Curated annotation (Swiss-Prot):
Segments forming a coiled coil: none
Gene name for this UniProt entry: zipA
Protein name (Swiss-Prot/TrEMBL): Cell division protein ZipA
Record's subunit section: Interacts with FtsZ via their C-terminal domains.
Gene3D superfamilies: ZipA, C-terminal FtsZ-binding domain (3.30.1400.10)
Length: 332
């Protein structure tokens, strides 16, 4: 079965190949025959287009010169002149009939240049000559003059003088009134800092708390005394006498302490604050408050933070000192 199928496929393939070859031969032969059939017409047209101009002139000459008629045919380039100024031929006519109008003989006339010669084909010239023989007195159709035949046009003469435009009165322009610049409003100066509050925080490590007993012992050793508003104050004298330099309060509201309940008390931290200006030297008072905060932090195992509750840095200390100087200068 497979052998028969293979044989059938081979036969069908061979037939298809032979059919393709025959179709290709037939198509090429058809194209070749059409090519040879169109070639003579193209060749004759090409020869007619490439024919020299001298041959056209000779054909026109043979048509114009005739022995049967004494007159010459009018030139194509001068129909207008022949129609306006007819000239009688110099040779007498053999017959008694009146002499037809004719222009000057073409033999004594200079042939027009190549640019003025009519671009007619040979066949058209022959037909035109035959019509002239049949009707010698009928004038040829008027031909439109070419650009080369027209006489040059002289340019128009420019006027000897130019007319001056009439003087128009200009409107009077009033000078603009110069506006005096108004003085700019004085810049609003910021209010001078007359007083400020310097704050330090002492907090436990990692969110822890500070016990009440150890906190009370450290605060008393730093020279604080329990006093007004239920908070501790540092006076100019460690014994608790004299003006208050700075104070210590609880970070948790209401910020007060109860000395009798310190054994059961705990807090995340305490806050120390100093009013500026204060009694005595403000710089020395701030230095004393910073030393007290560091001592309490060491006793309770905490850290010292600034007024934004960040770690105290040397740059922040310079900021505190600058605020102190500004307030002191403004109050001087």
């Amino acid at each position: 079965m497979m052998q028969d199928l293979r044989l059938i496929l081979i036969v069908v393939g061979a037939i298809a190949i032979i059919a393709l070859l025959l179709h290709g031969l037939w198509t090429s032969r058809k194209e070749r025959s059409s090519l040879f059939r169109d070639r003579p017409a193209k060749r004759s047209k090409k020869e007619r287009e490439q024919s020299p101009i001298d041959e056209l002139d000779e054909g026109v000459g043979e048509v114009r010169v005739r022995s049967a008629h004494p007159e010459d045919e009018p030139s194509f380039g001068h129909f207008d002149a022949a129609r306006e100024e007819p000239v009688v031929a110099p040779k007498p006519a053999p017959a008694a009939e009146p002499a037809p109008r004719a222009v000057q003989p073409a033999a004594h006339q200079t042939p027009p240049p190549l640019s003025q010669r009519p671009d007619y084909d040979d066949i058209l010239l022959d037909n035109y000559a035959q019509e002239e023989d049949d009707e010698p007195q009928q004038p040829a159709p008027r031909r439109e003059p070419r650009v080369d035949d027209l006489p040059p046009v002289a340019p128009a003469a420019e006027p000897a003088f130019h007319a001056e435009p009439a003087h128009q009165p200009q409107p009077e322009v009033k000078p603009a009134v110069a506006h005096e610049p108004q003085p700019a409003p004085a810049a609003i100066k910021p209010a001078k800092l007359k007083e400020t509050v310097l704050v330090l925080h002492v907090t436990a490590h990692q969110g822890g708390v500070i016990g009440g007993e150890i906190l009370l012992q450290s605060v008393l050793q730093a020279g604080f005394q329990f006093g007004e508003m239920g908070i501790f104050h540092r006076h100019i004298s460690p014994a608790g006498s004299g003006p208050v330099l700075f104070s210590l309060a609880n970070m948790v509201k209401p910020g007060s302490f109860d000395p009798e309940m310190m054994s059961d008390f705990s807090t995340p931290g305490v806050s120390m604050f100093m009013m500026v200006p204060s009694y005595g030297d403000a710089n020395q008072n701030f230095k004393l408050m910073l030393q007290s905060a560091q001592r309490i932090a060491d006793d309770v195992g905490g850290v010292v933070l600034d007024d934004e509750r960040r770690m105290m840095t040397p740059q922040k200390l310079e900021t505190y000192k600058a605020r102190l100087r500004e307030v002191l200068e403004n109050n001087a």
